[in-house]
Amino acid sequence: MDSRMDQYEVMEQIGRGAFGAAILVNHKTEKKKYVLKKIRLARQTERCRKSAHQEMALIARLQHPYIVEFKEAWVEKGCYVCIVTGYCEGGDMAELMKKANGTYFPEEKLLKWFAQLALAVDYLHSNFVLHRDLKCSNIFLTKDQDIRLGDFGLAKTLKADDLTSSVVGTPNYMCPELLADIPYGFKSDIWSLGCCMYEMAAHRPAFKAFDMAGLISKINRSSIGPLPPCYSPSMKSLIKSMLRKSPEHRPTASEILKSPYLQPYVNQYRPFADISHPIHSLEKPITSSRSSQKSMSGSQCSSISGSDIDSIQSSERNTSGPSTSSNNTIDTEGAEATDHVSVKNCSRSDDVKSNKETVGPELERQDSSKSIHVDQRPRNEIKQPKIIKKILTTLREESKLRQNNSPIRASRVKLNSPSNREQLSDDSKHSSDISSSSKSSEVTSRESAKVICEPVKRAQASPPLKHLSPIVEHSPKAKIKQDEPLQPDPAKQAMEDVDAAVGKVKNRTPPSYSRRLSIPPRRPLGAESPLHADTKRAHNKVIKERAKSPCRPVHGPDNDIIEPPGFPMAPPSPLGGVQMKVGNARAKSAPPRAVSIKEDSSDCSSSTIAYAENTELSEPSKQDSSAQLVSSCKCSIPDAAIQKHDLTAMPSSELNTTNFQKSMASNDDVCENLALEPSSDISEQVSIFKDNVPCSKISQSTANAIVQNDEDKFTVQELLSSVADIAPFVSTKNFALEKGSPPIQSLERTSSPHLNPPIEDVIHVIRHSSFRVCGEQAVAENAEMGVQSSDVGKLLNVVREEVDSRSIPSNNLVPHRLPDCAAPKPNISETNTISSKTACSDVVKFLTVPEVNSTTTAINNGFKEEASPTKEILDVKSFRQRAEALEGLLELSADLLQHNRLEELAVVLKPFGKDKVSPRETAIWLAKSFKGMMNDEASRSSM
């Protein structure tokens, strides 16, 4: 028997997607071009096969002047589904907009397209077909610039007023109710149509953001930019009416056609559409298609959910079950099906590429087990918005998907984005086990059983993504669903949020370094941390202590309450406070307002140092109001290292630089006392270098560090070398600490004669137990204790991001070693009893971990410093700074390549790409941080 393919002459491949290839063919007898969509069933999952059959059946039933023409469909050799559709010479709308190169379309042309699209959508909805993937790249054009709506791979047949809950489509075109995981109906197509019309008018997407959180926020607020002024207010209001947040407030397709403004164009093009083509039964078109489907294996036709069967039977009594399946889930299981990219009927080179939008991939999550009506839902099935995690997970997995597929891409990706592979295999097995005549209750019970069994493997979630959960207005039916408990399953939500957060971090930070800088999610109360067992007990102790006094302020050594007014109290977190014991001192917890994000460091090595990347500095509204600088550092230290020096610190102790109260001097000047605390063998020093800040007069009673009143951003640089080698990487001036009395040497600065010498804002926060200031005895003790260790001087430099180290080379001062003025001492009492009349006459403020203890005669040393030139503010729009950052990244990449450090090179280059989000700040941060690490390692290897 001759194959139907013999009737066609293959010309070229014009697209490739998840199912297979889109091939331009020429009918040998008709001498007419068509598009052949060839789907290889053997490489697809059951759901993909069903979706292919569904598209073949659905498009065969649709016949409308403004919908892509259907020619024929058949199954080739039992393993290929072939769908032949009309060829659109004009390409698609997305390509046409690119060719326009910023030139807006005339309003008449837009209204013509609008009328044709509205007629096509009204035809679909009147026949209970929900397209679910309306976007500009699925709107094709003939050579006469007429509309042809295509790509029905995600279309679904609904009852008259029914809703569906499967999350499908392209994120930029998704409606608020779909993102909120609320059942949606035909109004979701109206929203997508509004997005298309906005994009066709403005030549930019209606909703666009750098990340999924921003996109969801804009969609939930229906926040769109202004349309070009060249269009009439009537057209603008019509487009905006389709983008209303509440589905009830959006017009239907028939109401759009009745709009007085659009009426002339509707009347002009309706005669062609008025030939009222009803949906044909599947018995009429392509009888060979019917016969070939009968020969297909039972597994290919057995995965129709009961709810879809009910929907099909109620709307079309004369059609067969397998052919009318409306279950559209696309599965990503298997290497062959990893890149589910929809094939357009008419695709161009621009469309074959990945979507340029940062949130271009499309996601699909099937809730076939969920019945639409509330009374059919089991009580133990908890429904919650999960689309955010799905989208973020898919964005993270997109890079993996590219590696297993052809370099040619279509413009969207449909992913099931499962939480684990086991669930995927279970879904496939269940879908093949359910016969086409099974009831929806059976499917629902199976799915709910999985929901119950699954969460026990998950950990408690983190809250960073909870603010992303959209809150939308919805229809009465949706409101009934919302009345049900929406509390997320804590164990299930945990892994989703953690995975999403970690996925975002992977694009920005180098996971291959043992010393890594990352922003992990903050765990809520009660979350288990992967630390020692005794650390967990200590955590529990602190948690109980906080539960008793959740809002207890930090007390200084003189019982002064350090509690900046006007700051809201955040909920306490087990990682939010200081959990360190020094001597026999009681471990005090920091106030719950310490909200810096921290990382759970594993107990693998003392070199695993994590620091909060975003150290927040809250800016006061008034000059005399107090603010706080919250920064946190946490390091995992082996027990042996702690016991070696008789330090009674916890095995994985945390350091939280507690709230420094900010106050202002009389003449709007700011000064800052110096906080010093030397460390022993394994010492991490956190140095916050700030620009010089003039001060007019320092009050003798000032007991708190005063921080510069600026919107400061900090970037972490981790330097693992001796302190004397830090100079090239310090972008602001540092105090030199030398031997003798006074231990802190003065630095001269030329200043106005009427001003007192200003003090450089330097805060040294050094880890571990208590210390004692003494003169020569301290030097002798340090000579005995661990100075010879190569690990001394491990330094975390928290440097101003705004300051470019290359622009101030003259001010890089070499910080000397610290053992001259301090030595470790296990007795904590000495740190709290330093007299201002001591022989050293030194002014050193000590920071015992939960407390801030300082003396009041810091001005007696007469600090002076040199004048520094005007600092350079970080400007992401500065081409010079961006060029320097790029140059630094290129040098780093070349160096890594030269040393064959390919894994680290991959980490450096991972955040960049035409389909990746790489803010300019990230590029500059990477250029500085990684280059600093490389230079530091080179200096250590040369020693």
Swiss-Prot record:
The family annotation for this protein states: Belongs to the protein kinase superfamily. NEK Ser/Thr protein kinase family. NIMA subfamily.
**Which BP terms does GO give this entry?**
microtubule-based process
Q: Which residues form the Protein kinase domain?
A: 8-262
The answer to keyword ATP-binding applying to this record is yes
PANTHER family to which the protein is assigned, alphabetical: SERINE/THREONINE-PROTEIN KINASE NEK (PTHR43671), SERINE_THREONINE-PROTEIN KINASE NEK11 (PTHR43671:SF98)
Report the EC number(s), separated by commas if there are several.
Answer: 2.7.11.1
Where are the catalytic residues? Answer: 133 (proton acceptor)
Kindly list the GO CC terms recorded for this protein.
cortical microtubule
Q: In which tissues is it expressed?
A: Expressed in anthers, pistils and leaves.
> What does the record give under GO molecular function?
ATP binding; protein serine kinase activity; protein serine/threonine kinase activity
Pfam families annotated for this entry?
Pkinase (PF00069)
Gene name as annotated: NEK5
Described purpose of this protein according to its UniProt entry: May be involved in plant development processes.
PROSITE patterns with a match to the protein in the record = PROTEIN_KINASE_ATP, PROTEIN_KINASE_DOM, PROTEIN_KINASE_ST
Q: Give start-end positions of Low complexity composition bias.
A: 288-329, 510-520
Q: Where is the composition biased (Basic and acidic residues)?
A: 337-356, 362-384, 423-432, 474-484
Superkingdom assignment = Eukaryota
Give the protein's recorded name: Serine/threonine-protein kinase Nek5
Q: Which organism is it from?
A: Oryza sativa subsp. japonica
Keywords (A to Z) from UniProt: ATP-binding, Kinase, Nucleotide-binding, Serine/threonine-protein kinase, Transferase
